[in-house]
Every structure is written in C-alpha cells, then in structure tokens.
C-alpha cells in the first residue's frame, strides 16, 4: 500500500489479479516443500495467489497483508477450505506468530517493502522476524528480483528519465486506469533507487483521478542477503537463479533461496 487513494488501491488490487497470473513460482515452492503437510506463513500474501494453492495442496496456511482490497479477494478463491486463514497486518511492525515450518517471502516482497523504516534495515528485519517465527529446523523461502539489477554485482549510480507503463486496463467495476513509473535515480553509495509511481484512472462516470506517489527501493546484492541470513541463524540449502531451477549466474537478475533455521 503506497498511501494510495481508495479508488486507486481498488483498481490496483483488481489489476494485480488480472495481470499477475503466473504459477511457476507456486509450483517451484511446492516442489521444495514436498508432500508432507506443513504449517506455513506467507508474509504479504496479497490476494492469495500463492497462499490458496498452498492450502489446496493440503498445508495449513496463514497469511497477512496490509492491503485490505487485496485481502478481500482471498475468500472467493479459498472457497470452503478450512486449512487457511488470513488477516490484515504490517510486516514490519506487527507480530508474525511462532512455530511455523516454513515462512514464505515471495512475490519479491524484499524489494517491495512499504515502511517509514530505513529500507535496508527493514529488509534485514523481515529476515530476522522470519527466523523468530519459525520452529527449529524450519525453512525460509525467498524470491528476490531487485528491479533488473544483477544480484552478483554492485550497480553504478545512474539517472534515467522517461515513463514506463506497468499496468493498463479496466477494473472489475469498469474503471479504466494506467500505472506507470517515472524516472529512476539510483545512488550507488546508499543503494537507493528513487522514482515516481503515477496513477491515472478514468471512472465510468467520466471522473478522472490522478495521483503521483514518490517511492524508493533499496538494492541489496546477493552477498548482503547471504550476510543477513547467516546473522539471523539460517543455513542456505538450495539457491537458484529463478523459479525454473536454473543456477545463479554472473548475470542473474534474481535469486530464489531456501534456507534452514539452525
């Protein structure tokens, strides 16, 4: 949630379900988990794209998210499943619970944190909170894709102008909208990328809603992720460059990590 107007948040939730339909990450996660029933927590579960399939696979799942519009979509997807629950909560400031077998940080959440906390500190905090929420021997699953940056390299400072349309379409209520990103200012010293997220929505009644939101993200290279995991008491057991099981290469722009709490 980026302090969006309610109309914008509703449009984003609808567009997420229309645009983000891949299942390869879910299938890959299920292959790592195995068939034995597990108690699983998904952090920032959104509309249940991952949470619901985990429940349908027989696992007992819990999820939370700070976006009420996304959470409202889970019920219809879950149907009569009794092994799934979810609530509204803040990943940085709220309690995650304890004694889970697996904590899932998927959907690139480590690169999409919304908080007033220092970004790198918030990234490390999520890993530490995952450790606290896990039972001894439990696992953390991380899917991390830092905005096209190669995870094995530092990134030089740069400034890009221009506009990139991310989503464009009509929501479930017939309102047409567009979400785009404007500019990109990356500081290699801080690892912070700054840009503007622009929303333009035309409602069915002709009303036009526009909102610009200043955003920033922190690029943590793979070496830093490894340090955070080690400091939190994790041992990496499996690591891949993507959810197809390919190895991490020199030019990989993402990483999937499955690490055990020791």
Language model: regions and residue ranges:
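SAM-dependent methyltransferase
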Residues: 141-226
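A short SAM/SAH-binding and catalytic strip from SAM-dependent methyltransferases
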Residues: 101-121
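A short glycine-rich, Lys/Arg-flanked "PGG" loop and its adjoining helix->strand segment in the class I
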Residues: 121-136
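C-terminal lobe and adjacent flexible extensions of AdoMet/dcAdoMet transferase-like proteins
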Residues: 216-262
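Class I SAM-dependent methyltransferase SAM/SAH-binding core
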Residues: 51-93
């Amino acid at each position: 949630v980026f302090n969006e107007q309610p109309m914008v948040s509703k449009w984003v939730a609808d567009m997420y379900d229309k645009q983000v339909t891949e299942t390869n990450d879910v299938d890959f996660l299920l292959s790592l988990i195995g068939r034995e029933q597990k108690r699983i927590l998904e952090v920032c579960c959104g509309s249940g794209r991952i949470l619901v399939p985990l429940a349908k696979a027989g696992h007992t799942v819990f999820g939370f998210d700070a976006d009420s519009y996304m959470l409202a979509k889970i019920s219809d997807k879950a149907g009569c499943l009794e092994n799934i629950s979810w609530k509204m909560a803040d990943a940085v400031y709220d309690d995650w619970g304890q004694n889970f077998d697996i904590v899932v940080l998927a959907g690139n959440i480590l690169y999409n944190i919304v908080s007033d906390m220092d970004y790198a500190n918030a990234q490390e905090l999520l890993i530490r909170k995952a450790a606290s929420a896990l039972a001894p021997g439990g696992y953390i699953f991380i899917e991390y894709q830092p905005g096209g940056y190669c995870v094995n390299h530092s990134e030089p400072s740069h400034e890009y102008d221009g506009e990139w349309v991310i989503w464009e379409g009509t929501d479930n209520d017939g309102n047409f909208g567009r979400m785009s990103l404007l500019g990109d200012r990356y500081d290699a010293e801080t690892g912070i990328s700054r840009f503007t997220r622009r929303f333009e929505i035309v409602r069915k009644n002709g009303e036009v809603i526009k909102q610009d939101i200043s955003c920033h993200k922190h690029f943590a290279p793979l070496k830093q992720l490894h340090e955070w995991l080690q400091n939190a008491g994790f041992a990496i057991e499996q690591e891949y460059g993507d959810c197809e099981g390919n190895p991490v290469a020199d030019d990989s722009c993402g990483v999937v990590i499955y690490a055990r709490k020791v």
